[in-house]
Amino acid sequence: PMTKVLNAADISKALNAFEAPGSFDHKKFFQLVGLKGKTHEQVKKVFNIL
C-alpha cells in the first residue's frame, strides 16, 4: 500500500488542498504528500503503486 512509503496524513492533506476543479499543482502536490524528500527508489515505488 501507498502508506508504506507515504504518511497517510500527508496524503489526505495533499488531496484536500486540491479539491477544487482546476486547482491541481503537481509540484505543490509532491511537496505536500512528502515525495520531495524521498529517494529515487521510493518515488519509483509510489508511481508503480499508482
From Swiss-Prot:
The keyword Calcium applies. GO terms for molecular function: calcium ion binding. GO terms for cellular component: cytoplasm. Residues 38-50 form the EF-hand domain. Keywords: Calcium, Metal-binding, Muscle protein, Repeat. InterPro entries: Parvalbumin. It comes from the Eukaryota. Probably regulates the activity of the caudal neurosecretory system. Binds two calcium ions. Belongs to the parvalbumin family. This is Parvalbumin. It comes from Scyliorhinus canicula.
